[in-house]
């Protein structure tokens, strides 16, 4: 008799509520299994209380099932509040466990609390409070959550899960922990089927032998492969790579950069710049192009080397640098040009190959090939050698003539990175303009000697010429020496090619070059939208053609 009265009471509650809410779009929460049920209007006015009788209480609403130990159903509000050992299932898209859930059938929203665990076939989400919106198929938390999938453990203070897309959107103190790396980020999107992460704020990736920083980027956590932008930096292979756009592939041991790239090598005190560069760790090599320049710190001065391409190979302390073609050097007290530069750090030898020219002070130096030798211990310039057709030319300050010394071989000696002495050996000759104390021209001296030594002052100008062996020659009055005889056969004045500052190492054509336009990494839905737009445009064109 007591149970009959209870059923009558339930009908009395439910019938008015149905009359009040007759919106056909709103579906009622169904009682699949009620177990034991009671009414306590003092504690739960207008509600029915359902309790497990050994089998769990079960409710259903538009494809969502809720099992629990205890539930309070407000039929008028289309609201159920469940307690104790709760299990929720929505088709094959998600399963959820908790100790508390409040589900609103009118809004199709839920709040789950206490040891909340949400699962699907690709991931598990754990938190203490989770909000579920079935209209948008989204679940989100605001007070720390942990997500695990096949490869990674992800945590954040706040986060959202898009059930249909199988995508997480994390904000605030985001961390991805993998056995091979750790990601710390402000904001990121993560796709569980692929393991791809997209960054939208300050992000650091720390791997076993690399570290990445960016503020916009993409990372495949399964392949350790990524694309990074906005203040992007990669620390890899004892180098720091910066640029507008960076790419990294751990498996291939490869990193590259595009636009305004900078490679800092602290071991060798060098900086390399350009608009495209590659680092191949397995090959111990680095390749830079598109306005490349390598900057070496020499005491308090910097030396700039530029060519169309720069290739650096070899391990530290045994690197080889190749600069080609149209190679150029700028240093405050020395400049050079040639077809290519070949420099070896182990030997300290730098070779200038192909029509080389070196300027120091007011002097121009040419020959078939020029070698610069550095002291590998002090890393200072030590000496200079010019092989075959060595020629030093200095424009005369009081006339339109040129002072010249030539020989088969030239040896130069540096002191504190400044060229101080030049020795000419074998078949040496000189042409010098001679003046008296009143700076009046006395004549032009043409001499031949087996060994000539030049001493240079602080301004790198010739201050003294010494003939080591007895010279042979004459002093000619200016009007007695034909202009063609005032220059050696090898003479070419290349002063108009001289590089006067570090910006002039680039050709006029290179100065006009602009960085390429870079597009950021696109998420799958962005690609889908673009493809949909493209398909729509193609359909429209097809339709127009059909009408014609």
Give the role of each language-model region:
Residues 20-548:
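N-terminal amphipathic/hydrophobic interface segments
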Residues 15-19:
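Sec/Tat signal peptide C-region and signal peptidase I cleavage site
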Residues 5-14:
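Bacterial N-terminal signal peptides
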């Amino acid at each position: 008799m007591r149970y009959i009265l209870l059923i009558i009471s339930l009908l009395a509650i439910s019938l008015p509520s149905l009359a009040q809410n007759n919106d056909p779009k709103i579906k009622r929460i169904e009682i699949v299994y009620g177990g034991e049920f009671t009414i306590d209007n003092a504690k739960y006015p207008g509600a029915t209380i359902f309790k497990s009788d050994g089998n769990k209480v079960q409710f259903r609403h538009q494809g969502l099932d809720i099992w629990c130990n205890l539930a309070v159903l407000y039929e008028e509000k289309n609201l159920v509040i469940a307690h104790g050992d709760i299990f929720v299932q929505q088709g094959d898209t998600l399963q959820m466990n908790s100790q508390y859930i409040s589900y609103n059938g009118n809004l199709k929203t839920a709040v789950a609390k206490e040891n909340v665990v949400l699962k699907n076939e690709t991931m598990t989400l754990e938190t203490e409070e989770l909000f579920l919106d079935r209209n948008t198929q989204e679940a989100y938390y605001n007070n720390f959550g942990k997500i695990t999938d096949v490869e990674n453990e992800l945590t954040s203070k706040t986060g959202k899960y898009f059930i249909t897309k199988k995508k997480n959107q994390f904000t605030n103190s985001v961390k991805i922990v993998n056995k091979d790396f750790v990601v710390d980020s402000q904001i990121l999107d993560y796709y569980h089927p692929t393991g791809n992460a997209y960054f939208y704020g300050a992000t650091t990736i720390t791997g076993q032998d690399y570290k990445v920083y960016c503020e916009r980027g993409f990372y495949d956590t399964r392949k350790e492969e990524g694309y990074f932008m906005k203040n992007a930096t990669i620390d890899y292979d004892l180098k720091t790579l910066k640029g507008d756009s960076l790419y990294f592939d751990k498996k291939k041991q490869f990193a590259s950069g595009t636009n305004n790239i900078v490679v800092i090598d602290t071991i060798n005190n060098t900086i390399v710049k350009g608009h495209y560069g590659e680092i191949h760790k397995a090959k111990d090599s680095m390749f830079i192009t598109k306005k490349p320049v390598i900057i070496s710190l020499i005491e308090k001065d910097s030396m700039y080397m530029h060519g169309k391409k720069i290739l650096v190979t070899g391990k530290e302390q045994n690197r080889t640098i190749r600069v080609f073609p149209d190679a150029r050097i700028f240093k405050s007290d020395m400049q050079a040009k040639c077809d290519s530069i070949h420099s070896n750090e182990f030997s300290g030898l730098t070779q200038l190959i192909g029509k080389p020219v070196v300027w120091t002070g007011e002097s121009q130096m040419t020959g078939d090939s020029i070698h610069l030798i550095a002291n590998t211990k002090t890393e200072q310039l030590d000496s200079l050698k010019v092989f075959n057709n060595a020629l030093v030319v200095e424009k005369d300050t009081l006339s339109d003539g040129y002072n010249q010394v030539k020989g088969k071989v030239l040896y130069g000696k540096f002191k504190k990175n400044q060229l101080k002495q030049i020795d000419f050996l074998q078949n040496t000759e000189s042409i010098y303009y001679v003046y008296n104390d009143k700076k009046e021209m006395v004549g032009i001296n043409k001499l031949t000697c087996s060994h000539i030594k030049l001493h240079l002052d602080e301004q790198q100008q010739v201050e003294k010429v010494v003939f080591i062996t007895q010279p042979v020659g004459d002093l000619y009055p200016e009007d007695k020496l034909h202009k063609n005889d005032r220059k050696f056969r090898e003479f070419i004045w290349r002063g108009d090619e001289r590089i006067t500052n570090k910006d002039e190492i680039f050709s006029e054509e290179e100065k006009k070059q602009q960085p390429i336009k870079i597009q950021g990494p696109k998420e799958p839905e962005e690609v889908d939208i673009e493809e949909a737009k493209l398909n729509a445009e193609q359909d429209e064109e097809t339709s127009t053609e059909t009408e014609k």
